[in-house]
Design a protein with these regions (language model features):
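Short intrinsically disordered terminal tails
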Residues: 1-4, 104-107
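Active-site recognition of the HExxH zinc-binding catalytic motif
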Residues: 63-75
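Active-site scaffold of zinc-dependent metalloenzymes
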Residues: 5-61, 75-94, 99
Length: 107
């Protein structure tokens, strides 16, 4: 039986679409980070961008991307739970786990 890699890499997109909006994802060098220093990622619903710090390891970058993606989806749905950081963090973490542990179905 073939070994299944449980730690697959999640590709961070340059852009994707939600509700007809193009969402741009930028991986930003720390020297150009314009957000609070404690933040490692930021969703901006005004200009439809997700910024991620480039000093993160692969797994942390994936988790932060998924966290900001959850904010983006919830904001596009106009759902107030987007302001609940604990919910968004848990959802983003579980989403990252699911996306990096898929075992593909043969067709």
């Amino acid at each position: 039986m073939a070994r299944v890699d449980r730690h697959k890499r999640l590709a961070i997109p340059r852009q994707f679409h939600l509700h007809g909006h193009r969402i741009t994802v930028r991986i930003v060098p720390l020297a150009k980070w314009r957000h609070p220093k404690v933040a490692v990622g930021m969703w901006d619903p005004t200009d439809h961008t997700i910024d991620l710090r480039n000093d993160l390891g692969d797994t942390e970058l994936q988790q932060v991307f998924c966290h900001e993606l959850v904010h983006a989806v919830l904001d596009e749905m106009k759902h107030k739970i987007s302001y609940d950081e604990k919910f968004v963090d848990n959802f983003g973490s579980l989403l990252q786990q699911a996306l990096t542990s898929f075992d593909s179905n043969p067709r």
